[in-house]
Amino acid sequence: MATPVTAQCSSKTWELSLYELHRTPQAIMDGTEIAVSPRSLHSELMCPICLDMLKNTMTTKECLHRFCSDCIVTALRSGNKECPTCRKKLVSKRSLRPDPNFDALISKIYPSRDEYEAHQDRVLAKLSRLHNQQALSSSIEEGLKMQAMHRAQRVRKHQHESDNTTFSGGEDNCDSRSHVSNPSVHSNQEAGPSRKRSRASEDSGAEPDLSHEGGVRSPDPPGGGENGSEIELVFRAHPLLVEKDGYSQTRYVKTTANATVDHLSKYLALRIALEEEALRGGAEGVTVGEVSEKQYTIYICTGAAGGQYTTLNGSLTLELVNEKYWKISKPLELYYAPTKEQK
């Protein structure tokens, strides 16, 4: 059995047997042609500096490594007086010699050099464009995720601050709640008219306050301060009962959980009436007596495919609606349409 012999090369170590060391290649006696892919020769025709095909090939006299003329001259001018491949000493350009035979070989393999370079430029431009689009889409997705995360943090912070404000400034509500166990009736009598006055001012058509998310906050129902929990709503026009050119605006509302469907219906009627008056230029005033909770009917989507809508009873609270129909941690989506008698 032949024992392996180690042949040392400048860059690689080959394990060759005695047969491989001493054998002679078989000569081709007929006209057989061996096809070799140009890609397999790319490493032999590539400049180690620019990693592109050799142009105006220059060979080092000491170590016989090949480089592009511009690449090796630039490397020597930069101060590294050595071969970029093997680090042999190169004093100056006198250590280099042109290699026209290798240039002729490349021109034989690639007769249309300009066409090859143009094709390569097109491939690189296409890759760059695709990568830029992918980077842009991924950047947009990351930006949307960060915005959603920061928005959720702002919502929690705003709710926490509003709860603290309610607890610190809600002495009137505390007095009104303590009338059952506290014999002091004087504080309850003082808190009662103030609540009635605030309710009357809200029913008189005052502009609702803007919430932190750009929506509107509906008027609190009587006794709204007794329940600290709040529910966020998304009001949309009924897709089947409302014309597209009608009330197509999506409304975002935040109110207490013990508000009823009738409260929302009356608030919606008042809000739409005020908007219509503003569009008409304020020619006709809107009074509280003209607004009724019977003008609009509130629906909720209960079908899995989104095509089935259930009418909500006016006495139901939003908390019961959320527990019975919604049961997911996202704003409650409700739909409204004019009542058939009112329409």
UniProtKB/Swiss-Prot annotation:
Region (Interaction with HIP2) location: 2-180
Enzyme's top EC category: transferase
Claim: Transferase is one of the keywords in the record: yes
Any Pfam family: zf-C3HC4_2
Keyword entries, A-Z: Chromosome, Cytoplasm, Metal-binding, Nucleus, Repressor, Transcription, Transcription regulation, Transferase, Ubl conjugation pathway, Zinc, Zinc-finger
Sequence segments annotated as region (Disordered): 147-229
Record GO cellular component, one term: PcG protein complex
Pathway: Protein modification; protein ubiquitination
MF GO annotations: chromatin binding; histone H2AK119 ubiquitin ligase activity; ubiquitin protein ligase activity; zinc ion binding
Reactions accelerated catalytically: S-ubiquitinyl-[E2 ubiquitin-conjugating enzyme]-L-cysteine + [acceptor protein]-L-lysine = [E2 ubiquitin-conjugating enzyme]-L-cysteine + N(6)-ubiquitinyl-[acceptor protein]-L-lysine
RING-type zinc finger locations on the chain: 47-87
InterPro entries: RAWUL (IPR032443), RING1/RING2 (IPR043540), Znf_RING (IPR001841), Znf_RING/FYVE/PHD (IPR013083), Znf_RING_CS (IPR017907)
Sequence segments annotated as region (Interaction with nucleosomes via an acidic patch on histone H2A and histone H2B): 89-94
Compositional bias (Polar residues): 179-191
UniProt EC number: 2.3.2.27
Claim: Lipid biosynthesis is one of the keywords in the record: no
GO biological process: epigenetic regulation of gene expression; negative regulation of DNA-templated transcription; negative regulation of transcription by RNA polymerase II; protein ubiquitination
Function: E3 ubiquitin-protein ligase that mediates monoubiquitination of 'Lys-119' of histone H2A (H2AK119Ub), thereby playing a central role in histone code and gene regulation. H2AK119Ub gives a specific tag for epigenetic transcriptional repression. Essential component of a Polycomb group (PcG) multiprotein PRC1-like complex, a complex class required to maintain the transcriptionally repressive state of many genes, including Hox genes, throughout development. PcG PRC1 complex acts via chromatin remodeling and modification of histones, rendering chromatin heritably changed in its expressibility.
Name of this chain's protein: E3 ubiquitin-protein ligase RING2-B
